[in-house]
């Protein structure tokens, strides 16, 4: 049996991307942002199609993502941050709540969000992961923006067929 299959599309030309970056653990977050923006450019996204905003910490990321999503100006969003374990329960709280908020915004607004909020045991792990995680976030955002647009067209095609059927029935 032959089945239809969508091939991943990493062409970023014309895509509008919003990035929300935490300033807490700033050196790691700057490394994430640098790698992410560099990869977006490599994928064909232009600087004029990227907006980067910063927030104090990971718990503030979902609200900024929500405001960007509400604007309707973006094809995908990217969350960048670093939560590094300390000696208190705060690590679990920040990790879980920021992750849940990021996911909720994406689902509520039907908008892809690449979650590149690192959660690591120590600074060394965060530094070791920041470059590849930043690049990966760019690739995820571009691929998922293209995928959601392609899937949205499936629904548009079905709507057009229904409209044509309705017109034929009236004739």
UniProtKB/Swiss-Prot annotation:
InterPro entries: LS, LS/RS, LS/RS_sf. The active site is at 90 (proton donor). It is an enzyme of class 2 (transferase). (2S)-2-hydroxy-3-oxobutyl phosphate binds at residues 87-88, 129. Keywords: Riboflavin biosynthesis, Transferase. Residues 154-171 have a biased composition (Acidic residues). It comes from the Bacteria. Belongs to the DMRL synthase family. This is 6,7-dimethyl-8-ribityllumazine synthase.
């Amino acid at each position: 049996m032959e089945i239809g299959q969508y091939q991943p599309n990493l062409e970023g030309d014309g895509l509008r991307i919003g990035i929300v970056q935490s300033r807490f653990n700033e050196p790691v977050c700057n490394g994430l942002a640098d790698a992410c923006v560099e990869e977006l450019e490599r994928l064909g996204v232009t600087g004029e199609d990227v907006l980067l905003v910063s927030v104090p910490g990971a718990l503030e990321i979902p609200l900024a993502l929500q405001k960007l999503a509400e604007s309707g100006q973006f094809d995908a969003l990217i969350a960048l941050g670093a939560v590094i374990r300390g000696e208190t329960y705060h690590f679990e709280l920040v990790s879980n709540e920021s992750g849940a908020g990021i996911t909720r915004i994406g689902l509520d607004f039907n908008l892809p969000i690449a979650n590149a909020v690192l959660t690591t045991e120590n600074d060394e792990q965060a530094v070791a992961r920041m470059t590849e995680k930043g690049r990966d976030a760019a690739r995820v955002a571009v691929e998922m923006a293209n995928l959601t647009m392609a899937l949205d067209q499936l629904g548009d095609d079905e709507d057009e067929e229904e409209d044509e059927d309705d017109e034929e029935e009236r004739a």
